[in-house]
Structure formats: structure tokens, C-alpha cells
Amino acid sequence: MQSFRTEIENPIVEKDILELARKIELFKEGKIDEERFRSLRLARGVYGQRQLGVQMIRIKLPYGKVSSEQLHRIADVSDEYSRGRLHITTRQDIQIHHVSLDRTPELWAQLEKDDITLREACGNAVRNITASETAGIDVNEPFDVSPYADATFKFFLRNPICQEMGRKFKMSFSATDDDTALSFMHDLGFIAKSKIIAGKPEKGFKVLLGGGLGSQPRHADVIYEFLPADLLIPTIEGVLRVFDRYGERAKRAKARLKFLIKEVGVPAFLDLVKEEQKAFSYTNYPIDTTDFEQEITFETAEIPLVKIKDKESYNKWKQSNVIQQKQSGLFAIGVKVHLGDFYTDKARLLADLIKKYGANELRFTLRQNILIRHIRQETLPFFYIELEKLGFTESGYNSLNDITACPGTDTCNLGISSSTGIASELERVLKSEYPEYVNNKELAIKISGCMNACGQHNMAHIGFQGMSVKVGNLLAPALQVLVGGGVIGNGKGRFSDKLVKIPSKRGPESLRVLLNDFEDNKDDNERFLTYYDRKGKTYFYDLLKHLSDTSNLSEDDFMDWGHDKNYVKAIGVGECAGVVIDLIATLLFESEEKIENATQAFNQEQWSDSIYHSYSAIINTAKALLTAQGEKTNTQAGIISSFDNVFIDENKISLATKTSFADFVYQIKENEPTEAFANKYLENTKAFYKAVDSYRKLALEN
């Protein structure tokens, strides 16, 4: 562990990495509870996988942006600590697998040399900020949302208000009304808008709140048709503060923001946000966009001369994979990456290409692809030749034949049946039997290995969810077929209808049935969703019902795609959020750490951060005593109320503030984040912790 101790220039990052290393050692020594340790490592991008003894590492790449240097660094890390395979996720991250837990701190330290983080890539935190991959180059965009996504990432990274929420929190930025970043299915979704105010064009966002997929998808609500850009950060802060305080914590399946919105309603939720305004770090927060407005430059003006031999393939590639940018003479190249998987040898060659002949930028996309940006028109033939050598010129970027799929049973604990195996087979069927659909961008197929929808199956035109079906004494891998979802645009979307559950090996036939029926019966130029609505859910159920019959299964039906042995259902424990075992001593120890964090923030004159660390320490301390009493601690608001009832009203504990516990805690939203209040709140927090610690010691003695 010594090798990286003096190589990290940023002391905050160094502290993070050293803390992870220290906690790993304490965990191995049995000094940290497994569930508490899991919460810590998840917040550092370290995720358990299906195979025992190794970890998946999620590398957080805001809005998918990567430079040549960063891609080289990721490739080096993958070769050194993993197996050389890179997986692009539907949140524009990169995942690598089969990493030893002991080596994760040094892996992280290597990534930080090129400003790449693991922090909050997993766990109950603000996940990677996604954005349209065409942001900044889209001919139809009002403005580039990239600097706003970037500012959001930086502002909330390590921010105390969102370190230990009840569940993960996802945000997206769409460049245009096409809503390619899928605002309607996010906790907070933003769509770029421009509005004339006082005779001048102003930048802002349409804002959507409370969306999500999973087993119970919810369409987000529009809360602002136009939010001025300088109110973006304060608005997000308010939503996060309310979610942190009122969100469910004990029942994981009901802990996402969408369930809180459903419970209290949008108006009441926004009222709670207003109550927090006095505590905001900033009342408005102008975002500097100048770094994103620099002239696009190229390392060399030299253009290698090449000769295209197969002009038909080249023209087909240009038609389906090349996008004209709003910058005159520049184009973006879409690279279709099968299942989002590619290897470090190709990654390095690609990194060299964009450095020498591009503008040193690419973006990983929400559909698990790569978009190479800022390519001069005259270099397109050269790029085609070079990308062809890498196997990166397959046409059909963002088309029906560009299937989205999560890793499923390959590596994920929660995978029920293979998602990558069926995806490969469906792509084979489309290429060989439906070549006319290769460049069809109207339809999308998405696949998830379980109900959690990491592959976004329940918002696809045609979706598949991994399941199992019992046949006698045996289990067969199965797929639930969903139809009718999609992106409408401008914040509107559709969730797919669940139709039938079929054996996995019949997945290709279900696709044939759907496409053949559409081709045979659609009206002229009728779109798929229009056709689906016209025919209705029952029609499609009847169309597919025969495939659900399990009375005539063959031996092959009991083997999943890509396997030669009978299917075994093996589901582990999910780690998207920590399931917490509350040990009293551990909770109080964590309270001490939070008080220390509050003190450090105060000494650095970060008043707002110090106040929230103090608040977290108070809640954590109260939770410890309530847990010891067997009281519910589902929400922070519930903890505050219960502590008054159980300890203050019964005179078991007295507060230095001589108030109710609620009045003591809620000073946080009654005061602006000043030095004086931060100091007072911190001292009151220390006094409260001391009183609780004394009470507990006395209780243990008796």
C-alpha cells in the first residue's frame, strides 16, 4: 500500500484511498461489520460480483467523456488488475471485473493520476451524471449541456448531503427535445431549453422529478418547464436534502425517490424543498462554461492518404455511423460496441487515433457504444480504414441491431438468466434474417438479466427480462417479453407492457413473430408504437401465448444461452444499495468520524459542509440509541420524531439547547450556513454525542 501514499497530489483524494485501504485491513481483521464495510466499499466503486473472492470495479466517467490519456490509463489499470476487458454501462461508466479486493486502493490511486475517480460510482449516492453523447455538437441543441453535467458532478462529489442516502440517485442531461438522455426515467432529468427574458436569450432546463425503472417503473413529473441555469445546483441540493431526510432506509425495495414522491405527492415534496432553502450552500450558482467553449484544435494537420477499396461498405458506414456536427466541417463517428465489451489492445489504438488525428475526445454512450467527436471531413476515409482494423466499422450504430444488455449472469449477483447470450443470438437473427432492419433507428431492443432493469428492458420497444420457469422438478431459463415502450421526446416516455414469460431458447422466435406480424399488417409508413397501440396489448399477448407452453420442452431448453449444462438458478445478494445491520458500537464510532469531518470542514471554512456533517452525526447518534431500544429507524425524519418520544419526553436524556430534539436538529433549516451557526451547531452536536455516550455506558453498567 505504500507505493501510492506520496503520489496523490490531492489530499482529499489521498485520504479517500488511504481510508479504503485501512478499512479493508480492519475488515480482514474482523473489526468492521461486513454490512458496514460493504456500504463503504460500494461508495468507492467496489462492487461484489457473482464469482467469489473478486470484485467488479466501476469507473465513474461523468457524461462518458474520456481523453486519450484517460483511456490509456484505464487500459493499463485493466491489464494490471483485471483481465483486459472493458465494459461500457448504460450510465456511461466503464466496469472491469475479477479484481482482488486488496488491490483496489492501488488501482484507484493509478486512475487518479489522470483525474479518474471511483468515488460514488456505486452505493447509496449520486451515481454517474449522464448526458446526451452528442451534447456540444448537436445541430439542434439550444446550448451545450456538458458544462452543466460537469458542474453537477463536481459539486455533489463527496458532498455531505448525499453520502449516505436511503438509495441511489440518478440524474441526466438531454441536449435536445429528443431526450436521448432519458429524463423521464431519472430521479432528476434535465432537458436544455432557451427562453427570451427581457429581450435576451437565457439558458435553462425543463426539469423532471421522480422517475425510475426497476420492477415498478414510474414516469417522472415535470416540476419546471423552464428553470434558469443558475438555479440548477440549488434545486438539486434541495431535492437531495429532502430525499436524505424523508427517504425510506429500511425497506430497500421502497427506498428510491419515486416511492417518496408517490407517498407525499409532488406539491408536498416541493414544499419540503422550499423549507430547506435557507440552508442551501448557494441561493444561485452561475456555472462557468468557458472551458467548454474553447476552439477545437488538432495535434497535426497532416492527413494520411488512403484508398477505400469497398466503397459500398464505406458509404453504408457513413450513412449509419457518421453524424454531422454543428461545427462546420466536423463530424462524429459512432462505433457500435457489441454488448458494450471491448479490450485494452483496441482501446489503446483508439486512444492514439483520437489524440493524433482527432481532438482528443470520445464519449461512451448510454447505449453502450463509443462516439468519436470532432473528426475533420477529409480524415473520415482514414478513420474508416483504421477503425476497420479494430473491427469498429460495423454499420447500425444506435439501430435495432444495436442491442442493449446488462452483464447478467456473466458476472452479476442478481442475474437470473443470461442477457448477453440472448442478445448475441438476437443480433445474429437480425443480421441473417432481417437485413432491412440493420439501420432501423426507430426500434430498440433492450435486455436485463433480472427485474432491476440495468439493461432498461422495460422502456424498450421490445424488451426481455431474465427469469426462470419451473417445469416438473426442473428449472428452465426464461424470458419475460415486453412490448410498447420508448422515448416520445421532450420529457415524455412510455414503459413497456409485460406480455408473456417464455423459455429463453424461444426468445429468437418471439422476435420473429413480432417483426413478421408488424411487416405483414402495418399500414403504409406506420410506426411500430402506433401499430402496437392500434392492435392493443391483448392482440400481442395472443400472438405470443403459444411460446409460453412448457409441456413440450426439449433438453436444450433447460440450458441457458452460452451454456452446455442444465440451468441452475443462483441469485446472490444485491449491492446497488447497502442492507445495513445496525450495530450500536459501530454507529457511535461512525458518529465520531462524522464529528471529525464536521470539525475539519469548519477549519477549512466550509460552513455548509460542516453543518451537514454535524447533522449527520446527530442523526447517526440518535439512531444508535433507538436501535438499541428496538425502535424503527426507517427515515431520518422518523428518527427525529421517535427520539423525542422515547428519550426527550421521558427525560432520559436532556439537551444542552433545552429544546425538543426536533427543534435542536431542525436548526439546520432555520439558519443560513454562516460561520457562527456552523460553530454553534458543531458544539451542540459534540455535547449531544457526549450525553448519549454517557447514557449508553450507564445503561451497559446496569
Identify the role of each PLM range.
Residues 153, 240, 515, 599, ...:
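Structural signal for well-ordered, non-membrane alpha-helices
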Residues 241, 616-627:
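Short, hydrophobic/amphipathic alpha-helical patches that form generic packing surfaces
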